[in-house]
């Protein structure tokens, strides 16, 4: 499931976005990715996780101290990923799920003509890498759109522990269900919406996801290019630019380079769901 996160089924995604995965990493770096590793001992990681501002998003509610300690025992290190670097590649063996602590990623696949087809955008507090569960290999590339930091946990250990900790098992099921909902949302978006509806849905979804993490829901800094947005939405660059210009002319948004100020949220909602 490389396609993640369009306005859907929109409220469901927003609610589910508050659940995520945690601050764990015992994965060894892939040399070909040139990803910088932040070596940390067990006690240091425990402190880092306890103080992490993603803890409420990542950890299942209701775990006992003993259960938390068992999760802590799987921790090894965190990873820093520089802008433009790849976290995992299409075809690479699947071993981990990744929680994004900071930064922004895109997932993409190479189309037949050699261009990258963007299949999703992921931000801090969200999970990346679930595409590999199906056949034990990743089906897309994950590329950092800005300097980022991630935590990883071996999926085999997640499965083992979730069989013993009911709250963790429920959390796993909830995350997988969310990805199915998101996949359906993208299919709906690309199959039936006009250009204006697609871009409006994209902006609303991005605003909702940021707001659920304590950021402004009207002031957006787009980490992706317009070309990448167009690739994700199935629209040409010229169409994206024209649609943004139309939104500006109608007083719906103000745009300055990658900064987007949503002036009229209701107007965007009316575009997606006309009365």
Regions found by a protein language model. Give the residues of each.
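Cyclic nucleotide-binding regulatory module and flanking cytosolic helices
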Residues: 34-83, 127-128, 132-133
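Cyclic-nucleotide recognition modules
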Residues: 118-181, 185
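Glycine- and acidic-residue-biased ligand/ion/polar-headgroup-sensing regions
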Residues: 84, 95-108, 124-125
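Polybasic "coupling" helices that flank or enter modular domains
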Residues: 163-236
